[in-house]
Swiss-Prot record:
Molecular function (Gene Ontology), one example: structural constituent of ribosome
General function of this protein: Binds directly to 23S rRNA. The L1 stalk is quite mobile in the ribosome, and is involved in E site tRNA release.
Keyword vocabulary terms for this entry: Repressor, Ribonucleoprotein, Ribosomal protein, RNA-binding, rRNA-binding, Translation regulation, tRNA-binding
InterPro entries, per database record: Ribosom_uL1_bac-type (IPR005878), Ribosomal_uL1 (IPR002143), Ribosomal_uL1-like (IPR023674), Ribosomal_uL1/biogenesis (IPR028364), Ribosomal_uL1_3-a/b-sand (IPR016095), Ribosomal_uL1_CS (IPR023673)
PROSITE patterns per UniProt: RIBOSOMAL_L1
Name this polypeptide is given: Large ribosomal subunit protein uL1
Subunit composition and interactions: Part of the 50S ribosomal subunit.
Record organism: Listeria welshimeri serovar 6b (strain ATCC 35897 / DSM 20650 / CCUG 15529 / CIP 8149 / NCTC 11857 / SLCC 5334 / V8)
Name of the encoding gene: rplA
GO biological process, one term: regulation of translation
Keyword Hydrolase: no
CDD domains: Ribosomal_L1
Length: 229
């Protein structure tokens, strides 16, 4: 593993390795020790007591953060007719049909999220090998395969984030930018925690949130006490 740079080491020294911080303390500290030359993203990582290999312990969904993410999401909507008009009216960046399938196959990726009406999934499905590995495939669980394209586009633009448990049982989510007020970051943090608590699989045994941390784009992780949320 490559040795971290001096700025990272200096940031690390300001974290008490033996302490588990409250959500408020962790967010304040993450903001204080951030050394990026840009408005870095603040991210939370949950280590959950689930077995993702089991179908009944999969966790996936999306949540609208009350204070947004600080990032403007570019939305591509696959729809036709009235639904295409609705998507355009809602502020989608791109709206179309098979012409975008061709563009994406040719390497065009100037979007962050895809929304599709169910009748368009036959077309979008052709892009499975391209979109799947990038996590861009629309999915009913995250509200991106829907007839209500207006709601989908509005929520994404308002600060909707998707979450998904990985093979190791971790869930990562962005909760805003370093420039956000700490209180707004904590409110977003609590929103993510609440939705994950509600998503706890009935089959999950033992401690649900095993580890919890806050970090910035290049910064070290700061341990958080789940009880503080």
């Amino acid at each position: 593993m490559a040795k971290k740079g001096k700025k990272y080491q200096d940031a690390l020294k300001q974290i008490d390795a033996n302490k588990v911080y409250t959500a408020e303390e962790a967010v304040e500290l993450a903001k204080k020790i951030d050394f990026a030359k840009f408005d870095a993203t603040v991210e939370v990582a949950f280590r959950l007591g689930v077995d993702p290999k089991k179908a009944d312990q999969q966790i996936r969904g999306a949540v609208v953060l009350p204070n947004g993410t600080g990032k403007t999401q570019r939305v591509l909507v696959f729809a036709k007719g009235e639904k295409a008009k609705e998507a355009e009216a809602a502020g989608a960046d791109y709206v179309g049909e098979s012409e975008f399938v061709e563009k994406i196959n040719q390497g065009w990726f100037e979007f962050d999220v895809i929304v599709a009406t169910p009748d368009m999934m036959g077309e979008v499905g052709k892009l499975g090998r391209v979109l799947g590995p990038k996590g861009l495939m629309p999915n009913p669980k995250t509200g991106t395969v829907t007839m209500d394209v207006t709601k989908a586009v509005n929520e994404i633009k308002a600060g909707k984030v998707e979450y998904r448990v990985d093979k190791a049982g971790n869930v990562h989510a962005a909760i805003g930018k370093v420039s956000f007020d700490a209180a707004k970051l904590v409110e977003n943090f609590r929103t993510v925690n609440d939705v994950l608590q509600k998503a706890k699989p009935a089959a999950a045994k033992g401690t649900y949130v095993k580890n919890l941390s806050v970090t910035t784009t290049f910064g070290p992780g700061i341990k958080v006490d789940p009880a503080s949320l």
